[in-house]
């Protein structure tokens, strides 16, 4: 962990257990289906959702990707938004790299990238 902010939720929403379960199952289905090539090497179970923000016909779309892990007892959420990334699925491999780095003990912390730095 390079930097740790406030871990308390800023607010909450009122959602039924049934609706929350449906959302989580949909996010798990995406990881096990369309995104399975990206999550094949993920060290932890996860739920994810892709998004694409269309801009104009003559430019690439913006990509959005969110995920959480572990699936059964979430500990971390990752959100990525990149201009002109074409589609949210294009960001899945970056999210998997973040999850793997977070959940894999690393004895050599000298390779940790500092805050506000691009990941390798």
Predicted regions and their residues:
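Conserved active-site-proximal loop/helix segments of enzymes involved in bacterial cell-wall
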Residues: 1-35, 39, 104-120
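Short alpha-helix boundary/capping segments
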Residues: 15, 83-91
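Hydrophobic (often cysteine-bearing) scaffold residues that line and stabilize catalytic clefts
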Residues: 19, 91, 95
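Residue-level preference for non-acidic, small/hydrophobic
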Residues: 23, 49-51, 66, 78, ...
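Short, Gly/Ser/Thr-enriched beta-strand-loop segments that form substrate-interacting elements
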Residues: 40-70
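Short conserved micro-motifs at the rims of enzyme active sites and ligand-binding pockets
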Residues: 57-60, 79, 89-92
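Short, well-ordered beta-strand elements
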Residues: 74-84
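Short amphipathic C-terminal alpha-helix that caps PH/PH-like domains
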Residues: 94-102
């Amino acid at each position: 962990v390079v930097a740790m902010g406030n871990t308390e939720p800023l607010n909450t929403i009122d959602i039924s257990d049934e609706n929350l379960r449906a959302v989580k199952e949909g996010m798990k289905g995406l990881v096990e289906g369309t995104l399975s090539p990206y999550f094949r090497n993920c060290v932890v179970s996860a739920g994810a959702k892709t998004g694409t923000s269309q801009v104009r016909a003559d430019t690439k779309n913006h990509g959005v990707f969110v995920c959480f892990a572990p699936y059964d007892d979430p500990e971390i959420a990752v959100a990525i938004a990149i201009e002109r990334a074409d589609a949210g699925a294009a960001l899945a491999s970056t999210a998997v790299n973040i999850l793997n780095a977070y959940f894999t003990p690393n004895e050599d912390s000298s390779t940790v990238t500092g805050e506000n730095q691009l990941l390798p």
